[in-house]
Amino acid sequence: RCNLGTGEFKLWSAISGSNFDMVAFSANELGIEINTSTSSTNSLRSNALFRDIGWYHIVVVWDSDNAIDTDRIRAWVNGERITSWRTGNFPGSAGVNSLTNSTVLHTLGAKANVSQYFDGYLAESVLIDGLALEPTSFGQYDSTGTFWTPLSSATIKGLTFVTNGFYLDNTTN
């Protein structure tokens, strides 16, 4: 992440008309929104602030069938789960579908069809379809237990992506 401060900088989005899913930095908070015609807007804004220019490892899980509402959307940054949300409108019932697993435009680094570009570098982008993986599927703490580091590309390529999943490895570009 490079540009800090106000504004929204999209990491990922899917959009269809007024319905959308997105993960973004908004005024130094991590924001997650799922807005579909079958539910009200589910909007989360972290209490944790991300004011440092640097590398962030972000994992977001959308587990629509989870019986616990606060576990239907889960997020981790650098291996630490975010459990404190300034805004926490979680989906009210299990089974709410999102646009993530549909045939609409998906965009990395911007909101689909509009500006709000991410000012940073997306080293690796992964979408896992149908599984709710923990961050340890993608990274781990280093030998000192201090710094969160990504797993090798070969390890991530070995994950199960199911039908609509993907892995974009930009670390060598």
Locate each region found by the language model.
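Extracellular glycan-recognition modules
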Residues: 1-31, 65-69, 133-136
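A carbohydrate-recognition surface predominantly in extracellular/luminal proteins
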Residues: 1-4, 19-24, 54-60, 122-125
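Short, aromatic/His-centered strand-loop micro-motif at the edge of beta-sheets
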Residues: 33-57
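Extracellular glycan-interaction patches encoded by glycine-rich segments
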Residues: 35, 39, 97-122
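Short surface loop/edge beta-strand patches of beta-sandwich-type extracellular domains
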Residues: 42-50, 111-114, 150-159
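Localized edge beta-strand/strand-to-loop motifs within extracellular or lumenal beta-rich domains
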Residues: 54-73, 130-131
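Extended recognition patches within non-cytosolic domains
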Residues: 67-69, 83-88, 121-173
